Amino acid sequence: MTITLAELLESGVHFGHQARRWNPKMFPYIYAERNGIHIIDLVQTAQLLTEACEFVKKSAEEGKKFLFVGTKRQAASIIAQEAERCGAFYINQRWLGGILTNWFTIRTRVERLKDLELKEETGYLDKLPKKEAAGLRRELEKLKRNLNGIKNMKRLPDLVVIVDQKRETTAVQECRTLGIPIISILDTNCNPDLTDIAIPGNDDAIRSIKLIITKLTDSICEGSLGYDENNSDHE
């Protein structure tokens, strides 16, 4: 996986937050301050992103399962698109408390989603009184919005990729409680102590998020091919 400083620069990965909003623990990853904005050291970003890509590729080769998390507006569509591309699960609308720490309860909601989808597909809902059908369709839309990305998740993920550590605090806490490794884009207001694999970068700009998540996804896809080939060899 080749990552150049030019492409990081072009995507605005170097722009951090206002200096007054910084987390001092991010100091090692900050290159300078310009007009009250912290500038992230892209040499470190390139190195750490390369290492993260190698790690996810190796994990995918071992058949590990990934969960992508990013519920902010700028990240939502990228998270869904890239997760689907590499066969990962995702949460891109709202993190329901307990998705990981109370997985067995959440699974009942997932089963409810599947049940309602089946009833919609088979025309069962059309046979119900209009008011009842409308209520069930509203429930279906809500469940889809929140849980569609983990509909086929049968167990807890092995690795979680997070965009915006500050926003996804509950997801971070649940991962840490369960000892699930976190890979996270860390802006200058984040805490590197709360992640296992840090990628210093702008977690607000769409182009920055897309570049980093796409690089990780490409590596997962590459690793998954190796896993599929190894498995077919043993069949």
UniProtKB/Swiss-Prot annotation:
The gene is rps2. This is Small ribosomal subunit protein uS2c. GO terms for cellular component: chloroplast; mitochondrial small ribosomal subunit. Belongs to the universal ribosomal protein uS2 family. It is found in: Plastid, Chloroplast. Pfam families: Ribosomal_S2 (PF00318). CDD domains: RPS2. One of its GO terms (molecular function) is structural constituent of ribosome. The keyword Chloroplast applies. It comes from the Eukaryota. The keyword Acyltransferase does not apply. GO terms for biological process: translation. Keywords: Chloroplast, Plastid, Ribonucleoprotein, Ribosomal protein.
